[in-house]
Structures are given as structure tokens and as C-alpha cells.
């Protein structure tokens, strides 16, 4: 039958329909590819490098910080490589008249350390505190009195001393820290109720795994003590971090270059304590 003008043939209609369907299908496939790429991008983990060279998953860490303490500890234990050759130099009871010289030694050796400081001494040596913060050292708190009886006197006395020290540090530097070390170490004096009060306010308390005994020797003999304890930990295949206790003392500063050089010769690197690590309690 002859078609009249203006009427489309069945074959033309069918062909147009097929082209339209194909175009819609292509658009849908393109949208699926774009959406799939977008989802994979948003799901990509945000990873940063911490000051001790370890990788930290920011989103996972933030989520776990709001989760239960047990899950957080489990997470940190898997994230923290505690068996590597990293040492953490920590200095208590400062700042003091020799802290500036101590910072000179660390700067010359390109080493960062962690300082647990007392509130009255921070007020006395403000410039040393500011310099330590500016040069990238980790700043922690050691309380106020450094008196065993007063510090551990009540369930809230450690908390109050750390809060005062935290306020002092923040007034001087604008920096707020949660890292604390209690005088003479947490054991056996720090009670369960005192621990709960500290942790409730966000404080993370640290002890040490290596006591340099610089407070006892007051000379370079502490270097030998540190190296011997490190060797013992290596032989025991310990998975604990090498956290070295020292103090802002003249003899400690005098022998510090020797200690740092010997540690470097043995292949150790240096890190600072931070809130992504599992604290040690001796």
C-alpha cells in the first residue's frame, strides 16, 4: 500500500525507538560508572603519617575514639608497631636551668623527645617551654607538687594537679595536651578511682620501660644502664616500646650526645609519645 505524506513507515519508527533505547542505556551506564567511582573515592581511607613515622587511619581512629575502651585498645595495639627499633626519650621534672642546653643537644642531633613538665617550673622557665613546643617536641604534664603524699592524697588530687599543669601549659603556649606521667610512676600509688578520674577527663598516663637511673648516677654511667636494658629487651623479644626515663639534669645533658650517637650506631630511630599509641604502665 502506498503511504500518504506525513506518515512514518513502521521500519522508521522501529529504528528510531532502537536508537532512543540505546541512547538511554548509554546514559544509564555512564551514570553507574560515575556513581561507582564517586563511592569508591569517598570510601577511600584518609591516612596520615604520625610523628613517629607510623600510618594512622584518621576516620577509623575518630570512630574508635567514640567507641568502647576495649575496642579502642584493640585497635591501637594493631596499629602500633611496638617491636621496631624506635626509642622514645622522655624527660621528667623540668623544665630547669639546663633545659635550653638540652634542647640544643636535641636540635643538633635532629632528635625529638617528650617532656613531662611541672606547673611551677613551666612558669619559671617559660621560654624553654615555648621553644620545646616550637621545635616539635611532645609536651606532657607531670603535675604540680611532685610530692608523693600530696599528689596521691585523695581520689581527685592527681586530676586536679594535672588540670592545673594543663592550664599552665596552655597559657604559655596555647597548646593543650592529654599526655601525663605521675610522679615516681603510676605503680603502686595510683589507685583505681584516681585512674578513672584522670581518664574521664581525657588524660592518658604513661610510665616507662627503661629507667636510665640518671637521678641516681648523676654522671655518664646512665648511658651504660640504658644500653644494657635495651639489649636485655632485644634478647627477650619484648613487644613493648622502648620508653626511656630521664630528667632535666646537668649530668644527663652532658652525656646525652654520647647516648644519642650510640643509639644511632645501633640502628635506633627516635620518636615522641602520642595519643595514637598504647601507653605503658609499669
Curated annotation (Swiss-Prot):
Enzyme nomenclature, EC number: 3.-.-.-
The compartments listed are: Cell membrane
| Enzyme class, first EC level, given as a word | hydrolase
Q: Where are the transmembrane segments?
A: 15-35
Q: Quote the cellular component terms of the Gene Ontology held in the record.
A: plasma membrane
Domain (NodB homology): residue spans on this chain: 85-271
To which protein family does this belong?
Answer: Belongs to the polysaccharide deacetylase family.
**UniProt protein name:** Putative polysaccharide deacetylase YheN
Q: To which species is this protein native?
A: Bacillus subtilis (strain 168)
Amino acid at each position: 500500500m502506498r503511504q500518504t505524506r506525513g506518515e512514518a513507515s513502521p521500519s522508521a519508527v522501529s529504528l528510531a525507538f532502537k536508537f532512543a533505547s540505546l541512547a538511554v542505556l548509554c546514559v544509564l551506564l555512564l551514570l553507574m560508572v560515575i556513581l561507582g567511582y564517586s563511592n569508591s573515592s569517598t570510601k577511600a581511607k584518609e591516612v596520615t603519617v604520625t610523628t613517629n613515622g607510623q600510618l594512622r587511619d584518621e576516620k577509623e581512629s575518630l570512630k574508635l575514639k567514640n567507641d568502647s575502651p576495649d575496642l579502642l585498645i584493640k585497635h591501637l595495639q594493631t596499629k602500633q608497631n611496638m617491636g621496631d627499633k624506635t626509642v622514645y626519650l622522655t624527660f621528667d621534672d623540668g623544665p630547669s636551668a639546663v633545659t635550653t642546653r638540652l634542647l640544643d643537644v636535641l636540635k643538633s642531633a635532629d632528635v625529638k623527645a617528650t617532656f613531662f613538665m611541672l606547673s611551677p617550673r613551666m612558669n619559671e622557665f617559660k621560654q624553654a617551654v615555648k621553644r620545646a613546643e616550637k621545635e616539635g617536641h611532645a609536651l606532657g604534664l607531670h603535675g604540680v607538687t611532685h610530692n608523693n603524699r600530696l599528689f596521691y592524697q585523695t581520689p581527685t588530687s592527681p586530676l586536679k594537679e594535672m588540670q592545673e599543669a594543663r592550664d599552665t601549659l596552655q597559657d604559655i603556649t596555647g597548646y593543650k595536651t592529654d599526655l601525663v606521667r605521675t610522679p615516681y610512676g603510676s605503680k603502686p600509688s595510683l589507685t583505681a578511682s584516681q585512674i578513672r578520674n584522670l581518664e574521664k577527663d581525657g588524660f592518658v598516663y604513661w610510665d616507662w620501660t627503661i629507667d636510665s637511673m640518671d637521678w641516681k648516677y648523676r654522671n655518664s654511667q646512665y648511658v651504660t644502664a640504658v644500653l644494657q636494658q635495651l639489649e636485655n629487651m632485644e634478647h627477650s623479644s619484648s613487644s613493648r616500646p622502648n620508653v626511656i626515663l630521664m630528667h632535666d639534669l646537668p649530668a644527663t645533658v652532658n652525656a646525652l650526645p654520647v647516648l644519642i650517637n650510640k643509639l644511632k650506631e645501633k640502628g635506633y630511630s627516635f620518636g615522641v609519645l602520642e595519643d595514637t599509641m598504647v601507653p605503658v604502665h609499669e
